[in-house]
Amino acid sequence: MTDQPNNGAVANEENGPQFSLQRIYVRDLSFEAPKSPAIFRQEWTPTVSLDLNTRQKPLEGDFYEVVLTLSVTVNNGEEVAFIVEVQQAGIFLIKGLDDAAMSHTLGAFCPNILFPYAREAIDNLVVRGSFPALMLAPVNFDALYAQELQRMQEAGETPMPTVQ
């Protein structure tokens, strides 16, 4: 028996795939209620439109910034009740992945981590704007990623780059 630590296990961890969330933050946030206060006196029959987008960029070393943008427009009848947009971002340490795994991680896994924070920020803004709470349904980023890959293949485009 030896008093020496098993350095082989540490070396394997350093050489294998690594993923670590470093920071989550709001990059941009906006709320507009163009028809207030008149909109508050109308019967509330909302229709919700959600637009989402993700982008990623490399930082120094093996660090990446992923930004999830959610834009929500709620109409009450023919009028816009409110528009809210959040850019929820995260810094991730990612290394040791092949191109396909890196693309999936940046395009689906990281946005999945960011979504609950963006959803909460939107809900808080809506409530502070004196509107009923808006709880967005979960988003299947894996399915969206797969659809985008299929669309690109059918269009003859190269698969999603790992960085932009």
Curated annotation (Swiss-Prot):
<dbReference type="GO" id="GO:0015031">
    <property type="term" value="P:protein transport"/>
</dbReference>
<keyword id="KW-0653">Protein transport</keyword>
<dbReference type="GO" id="GO:0005737">
    <property type="term" value="C:cytoplasm"/>
</dbReference>
<comment type="function">
    <text>One of the proteins required for the normal export of preproteins out of the cell cytoplasm. It is a molecular chaperone that binds to a subset of precursor proteins, maintaining them in a translocation-competent state. It also specifically binds to its receptor SecA.</text>
</comment>
<protein>
    <recommendedName>
        <fullName>Protein-export protein SecB</fullName>
    </recommendedName>
</protein>
<dbReference type="GO" id="GO:0051082">
    <property type="term" value="F:unfolded protein binding"/>
</dbReference>
<keyword id="KW-0963">Cytoplasm</keyword>
<comment type="subunit">
    <text>Homotetramer, a dimer of dimers. One homotetramer interacts with 1 SecA dimer.</text>
</comment>
<dbReference type="GO" id="GO:0006457">
    <property type="term" value="P:protein folding"/>
</dbReference>
<dbReference type="GO" id="GO:0051262">
    <property type="term" value="P:protein tetramerization"/>
</dbReference>
<keyword id="KW-0143">Chaperone</keyword>
<dbReference type="InterPro" id="IPR003708">
    <property type="entry name" value="SecB"/>
</dbReference>
<comment type="similarity">
    <text>Belongs to the SecB family.</text>
</comment>
<dbReference type="Pfam" id="PF02556">
    <property type="entry name" value="SecB"/>
</dbReference>
<dbReference type="InterPro" id="IPR035958">
    <property type="entry name" value="SecB-like_sf"/>
</dbReference>
<keyword id="KW-0813">Transport</keyword>
<keyword id="KW-0811">Translocation</keyword>
